[in-house]
Each structure stands twice: as C-alpha cells, then as structure tokens.
Amino acid sequence: MTIVEDAKKGIITEEMKIVAKDEGLDPEFIRRGIAAGRIVIPTSPYRQVKLCGLGEGLRTKINASIGVSSDIVDDEMEVKKAIAAEKAGADTLMELGTGGDFLGIRKKVIDSISLSVGSVPLYQAFIEAARKYGSIVHMTEDELFKATEDQAKLGTNFMAIHTGVNNITLDRLKAHGRYGGLCSRGGAFMSAWMMHNEKENPLYSQFDYLVEILKEHEVVLSTGNGMRAGATHDATDRAQIQELIINTELGQRAHDAGLQVIIEGPGHIPLDQIETNVKIMKEMSGHKPFYMLGPLATDIAPGYDHIVTAIGASLSASYGCDFLCYVTPAEHLALPNIEDVITGVKTSKIAAHIGDMVKYPERARQWDLDMGRARRDLDWEKMYSLALDPEHARAVRNSRAPEDSDACTMCGNFCALKIVNQNYNLAK
C-alpha cells in the first residue's frame, strides 16, 4: 500500500509520526492531511531520506535546484552544490541537469545527501532523443515513460511532470500570445514535440499509465507548470489558468488512485496577483500542497533575483503557499555556483519564515520573540544562536569589532539598548 492508502484506512505510519514530531503536531493531523490530499511526505523504497512534510498546517518548505547544463558539465561541482544546499538548510533538492550522463550524475547527487531528490524526467527523454536522432521532436513515447521509470528506480522520489501541457492549453497559448514567451523548458520541449508530430502530450493522454509507474515506485507527482509566465506582464493569463484547471483535475485523479500530489504554480507574478494565484489554486485543487517557483515580483533585477524572490515568496507563503523553489543571484544570467546556491537557500528560508509568521503566528513568532529579548538584553551569544546563519552573524560583527563588547560598531558608545538598560528596566 502507498502512504495515501494507509492514511485513508486510518493507519498512522512511522513516517507520519516523524513528520508530526518535527512539526510539533499530532500524528493524527498528519494522517488526515495525507488522506485528504492536503499534505504529502516524499519517501522512497530505494533509499533512506530525511523526511519532510509539505502542505497545509506545516512550516513552509524550501527546495534548491541544481544540475549541469549543456555548456557546463562538472559532476563533482553538482555534488558539492547538493551538499552545500543541504548544509544551508534546504528541505528538498531537485536535480535538473540537461547535459552529461543523466543517471550517473543524478546517482552521485542522490548518494551524497539525505534530502528527498526531485527531477523532471522529460528533460532526459528529450535531450537523449536530440543526441540519438538529431532533434527533440523525434523522441518516442516509450522513451519518455522509460526515463520516468529509470529515474524513479534510482531513488528520485518526487517528479515535476508536465501533464497539463495539452492541445487545449497550447491552443490558448498560441491564440493569446505572450510578452515574455514560454520560459518553461519542459513546456517548450513538449509543445514543440506536439506541434511537430501533431499528437497529444502522452503524459496527458496516457495519464493513468503514468500514475501506475509513479505509484509502483512511491513517487510524489508534482504537476509541472509548463505554461507559467516568463514575465510579470503575462501572469495569470488564459494558458496558465487553463493548465492549472487540467492539472488540478488530474491531481485529484492521481490522489484517488493512491498517489501523493503537489500542484506547481507560476514563477513571475506581480505582488497584486499573488493572493489570487494562491487562492485559485487552493480552491480548485481541494487544498493540495502548492509549490511556487520563486515567485519573482519584478523582471528588472537580474543579479538580484534572489531578493526579488524573497519579496514574492514571503507574500506567497503568507497567503498559503506550502513549498517554495529558491532562486539564486545567477537566475536569468548563468548556471549558479556554490555561493549562489547557499545565498539562494538562505534568502528563501528567510522568506518562508516571514510568511509563516503570518500563516502560523503562534508557532513561528516565538523565534522572533526570543531574538527580540536577546537584543534587548545585549546577549550576543544568544543572538548568534538564534540567527538564521549563526556563523555569518558572528563573522560580520567580529570583522568590525567594537571597543565596547556589549555593543556593535553601528552605535558604539551610544547604543540605545545599553542606555535604556542602564537607566530603567523594560523587561517583559
């Protein structure tokens, strides 16, 4: 039985107990959430993973994406990025390589970390077709499903699968047009294949077969967002919403069949449309876990897109988004390096916490309360221990060490907190 089938029968599994303990919640809450499709726990029959719950009532989680490109193929660098992402605090990792030895690189990454690892199987299928036949459009349907199964057997335990890119969404896209084009690589691959071959997307037309494969290997289905906007001016357009309708319908079919399901959301959205996107998705999907790619709230800041994402992600989390894909400073410019990965994870973790302060104030705000008291008391060791990145906080202060060990060089002898502490008590 799958974990969904266990949950529907009232069985509380060991995985549910572990996630409940990590979240400070009752295991029955987790079981009910999985049974209803509101919570997922990526697991794998092929490897031990650090369990992580995603969904309503749980802390907002962060995914870090890595992977070689056709220009830069460095297996060991990707392994180092994966290790750095886990150390920096990522909750999951996606290996999205588009070059080199697909399964070989992914196996090295999977073996190097304890996190759940996700993938996009159609990347492998299309790129191997290009290598073999000279073009992605010559990929066969059997090759697509074989790539999916091969990656599942390797221990990949959640997959972004572009089920909603079908003839209906493609017609909507062509009729409506885009200012920023189509930025989803999976969406671009599949739509090109469909138009050349004049055929329906096999991930849609053979969806039940896809579910069988994923169910056999206990893989979480993340419905890929192939029609997402690549520019804020295209956000929430007809193609995006049409794909969302299809994905939420297919997501329910998959859950009814015993599969865990995540619904992917868009990546470029102006702030005034974020609430709309989250609420529409939650209502249409029956409140399944919502995974947003960023999101980026403006398009004008290449080199600083991790900051742009933090703004959009914090608002998204506050409205109910459950799962955020990080964005690094290299987004739209280059393949990220190790430092970019670390910065992306840290920035998105800050955004997730800010969102959780609104979404779950009783749980999330205690951390900030403790930090406020430590600052009031000028307890530097306590401040370091509470910091999101204790090593960085300590290093910054020590790099500009104050004469007065109670203060910092921002205020020096005129530290407001020290003056107040010397003259009256504001303890609370």
From Swiss-Prot:
Key words of the record: 4Fe-4S, Iron, Iron-sulfur, Lyase, Metal-binding, S-adenosyl-L-methionine, Thiamine biosynthesis, Zinc
Binding site for substrate: 94, 123, 162, 184-186, 225-228, 264, 291
Cofactor, how bound (note): Binds 1 [4Fe-4S] cluster per subunit. The cluster is coordinated with 3 cysteines and an exchangeable S-adenosyl-L-methionine.
Catalytic activity annotation: 5-amino-1-(5-phospho-beta-D-ribosyl)imidazole + S-adenosyl-L-methionine = 4-amino-2-methyl-5-(phosphooxymethyl)pyrimidine + CO + 5'-deoxyadenosine + formate + L-methionine + 3 H(+)
EC number of this enzyme: 4.1.99.17
UniProt record similarity statement: Belongs to the ThiC family.
Role, per record: Catalyzes the synthesis of the hydroxymethylpyrimidine phosphate (HMP-P) moiety of thiamine from aminoimidazole ribotide (AIR) in a radical S-adenosyl-L-methionine (SAM)-dependent reaction.
Protein name from the UniProt record: Phosphomethylpyrimidine synthase 2
Organism of provenance: Methanosarcina mazei (strain ATCC BAA-159 / DSM 3647 / Goe1 / Go1 / JCM 11833 / OCM 88) (Methanosarcina frisia)
Record lineage: Archaea, Methanobacteriati, Methanobacteriota, Stenosarchaea group, Methanomicrobia
